[in-house]
Amino acid sequence: MSSEQRRPWVVGISGASGTPYAVAAIGGLLDAGEDVDLVVSRAARLTILDETGISFRDSHWRDDLAALLDWKVSDTRLDAVRYWTAGDFAAGPSSGSYPARGMVVIPATAAAVAGISIGLSKDLLQRAASVTLKERRPLVVVVREAPLSSGTLEQLLMLSQAGAVILPASPGFYAGGQSVQRLVDFVAGKALDALGVPHSLLHRWSGQLGEARDAD
């Protein structure tokens, strides 16, 4: 494995609804042989519990991540994950000298968007995203709020102008809308596309109507 491949992607999960998007993105990165640095906000842990019934604990993060992915705890793919607590401002991703390749915030709340856009850094997720921007590394913000206020739209524009990719959690139904997981994978796959990571999460449009659906 090259030194470039060993550089991790930071995955930040904020408190927005959309835990399955984060799970699919993490699984896609690990299946691609990538290393992952995981940051879960305090609000995200509440959302994860509400949406999945799984209590994500700092002290048992590997067990809980395996449960979210529906993998065995012993799965060696999990060895590529490093977990950082949301309040750890001494963590690797808080520094520009840390060799992260980039970051995806999935899903992103309006509050996270606001904090990142003004460099608030109220927790490690926001700090890591701000560092990613200042170091000119890829930052993908998968915003999952509706409707969007004028203030949030302005903040998203600021992030876009600073170099971030703004990726609304808007699935393409041509990928096969009869399956919720297919719609989840579509959004996660678009996030990985924005990072430049190869994956097989989504069926790509080929110009042939019905081809993606027929692939099921």
Would you name each region that the model predicts?
Residues 1-139, 147-216:
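A cross-family phosphate/adenosyl-ligand binding-site feature
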